[in-house]
Structure formats: C-alpha cells, structure tokens
Amino acid sequence: MNFILFLLILILNSSSIISAGLQVKGNKLYDGNGNELIFRGINIAHAWFADRTKFSLNEINSLGANSARIVLATGHKWTKTSYSDLEKIISWCENDGLICVLEVHDFTGSDDPNDIISLAVNYWSEMKNLLNEHQNYVIVNIANEWLGSWNKGSLWGDTYSSAIKALRAIGLKNAIMVDASGWGQETGPIIENAHRVLESDPDKNVIFSYHVYAVLGKDDNSLISGFDGLKKTGVCWIVGEFGWFHSGANVAYKTLMNYCQNNGIGWIAWSWSGNGGDDACLDLTSSSTFSGKDLSDWGKYVFFGEGGIEKTSKKAYGGSGGNDNYGYCEGCEITATGDDGSKWGYENGKSCRIDINKCNGSGTDIAPNGFPYCSSCDVTVTGEDGIRWGWENNKSCVINESKC
C-alpha cells in the first residue's frame, strides 16, 4: 500500500513539473516551477513584418534572450493577428524557450477608454482559450501605450481596473501587463494608482511596465527618480520598451541597464528591426537581413554590453540562457566584440564564442586582440592604444607590424 501511495505521489508531482503558470508574488515574477524570472528580452514587430517573426525569434534566442514582446494588431488600425497566426507565434516562442509578452498596438496613444475596455478586451476574449492553454509562457500586455495624455491618473487607473475585471470575468488566466500612461513614460499615475489596479485583479497577477525614451530617460536623475518611485510601491514592474536615442535626444540607457541589474528588474529592448524614419536608429540589427550576424552598435550593447543579455539572461524553467547558451566557434571570423573583450562569431544560424587561444595559434593570422591581421600594410586609422588598423573585405583588420 505504501509503495502504491508513493507511486501515486510521484506521478502527481511529475505531471505538475510546469503547471502553475507565470505568477506575480509581491514585486517578483516567477515561472511555473517557482523560479524567479527577470526579463532580458527584445521587442519583435510581428504586425508589420509577420514573415520575419519566426526567424527573428530564432535569432534572439541564439543570442541568449529569455523573452520577446510581440507587436500584434486587432484589425482596427493594422491587419488583424488571427487565432492561427497567434498560435504559431506562441509555438515559436515556446520552442525557443522564450517567455512571450503579447501586446496589441492599435490603440497606442489613444485616450478613449472604450479602446481598452471594449476593443482590446474583445480581441483577447477571442483568443482566450489559446492564451489559457499557454499560461506557462504567455503574458497578456493589454494594449501598447494606451493613454497618451498626461496628468490623467484617475482615468488610467479606472480604465485598466475595468479592463482587468472584464478579462478575469471571461476566464482569462494569464499574467497581465499594463503600460504606464504618457506613451508609457509618465511616472505619477502608475505610482499613485498601481495598487488600485492590482487590487482589481482577483488573481493579483499584474505586471506594470515603463517605456523609457527621451522623457523618462532624458537624464540619470529623471530615470532613477521614476524607477525609485515605482520600486517603493512594492508592485512587480519591468521596462517594457527602451532605446538609446529618441526624438532627437539621448536616452540614459546605460544607467537603465545598470539600475535594472542592481535591482533585479526586467527589461525588453526596442526593437529587433524594422523601425522607420527617425526611429531607424533603434534597430538592433539590419532591416535588410533581420539577422543576429548584423547587429547595430545599439544591438551589440544590448546583447554584449555591461548588464546586457549575454551576461545576465537566464531562461525560464531552467532553460539555458546568457553564457550557457553559447559554444565556441569552429572558425575564427569575428563579428562582434563584447565590452569584456570577448570575441564573437556567427555560425550555423547562431552566435558563438571565438576561441582566442586556438585562433592565435592556428595559422589563421589572428592578432592578440582577436581581430584578423590585414594581408596588406595599408593603414586606415590608428587607435589610442597605438594599434594600427586597416580595412579589407568590408571588415576591420590589424596591421601586422612584424611584416609591415
């Protein structure tokens, strides 16, 4: 009898290895196994580049991201993301071990409560069964940057409280995310009303989100003040979007990443690729290729900089992320250099570490700093450290002083 009871307990436990769904407890988010989850993710513009979504998710996974925030559409402004499309997106995220934050972008900047309480809720209601099946990986970000106006804290709190009650009433079980007002950058309303919004959810499973650009992130003091204010409320919050430059001004992105690392706060950078006009500088990689092989300077910092994904990302449910996700390259071709001096290549569709010891002694003409030696002696620039550089085959190379 005792042996049978033991087997029954074992079966019950094994069937619930991943069962609780993503859950907020206090100011932290936990996966279904009870592991703390700190977002280190990337925004993916599915609504405008649907044919690139699967590839983009594979790329950010190969670079170590643990999450993706996906731009969807209800059909009110852009082509509707259908049930079958959403099913594919979720499966791609899960196959890559990425926590999937889903947001509808149609109501960005809108001040109309009906857009949230009716239109956004109706869209999520249509998708409810699919969303509930995947509550271990899916978070519902009700709407991107609803309420563009400032100083309307009561409207923000009332509207989101009503929307959350409506979503729970139709049976949605997923964790919910709510953006700040003022295009995601206003601090007062979210600080003053976050607890009221949280209390509207019978599950108390709400994550709050700042978006950081040239207002909230205009300087270190503004950013730290806004972050400290929300931190003091004790709610669970993340940075759902941020860039390095916006509206003609720099953003305190390095301070942001350091603050988040020091305080256990998650972030999701904007955005993988496809930005237009003045926002093209926010592309993390080439808009032509969408490839992790072609990271911009912004992309290199997000992945390899201080507090970046390479150093800090940990996958949910014990999956590999950050350094654990990489092996050494077979070859010695360098495509990026981390802030810590690490050299990186790109092979077989994913990033890999350059084995400097192997490459320096392999006869491949690799300089001690990990870059290849030039075949010629034509100098294009001299670094502050005295190293002379050339340019061959559309890449930087080191002048070989022993030959030149």
Give the residues covered by each predicted segment.
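N-terminal carbohydrate-binding accessory modules
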Residues: S15-S67
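Aromatic-lined substrate-binding rim segments of carbohydrate-active enzymes
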Residues: R52-G109, I117-N122, S161, R168-I170, ...
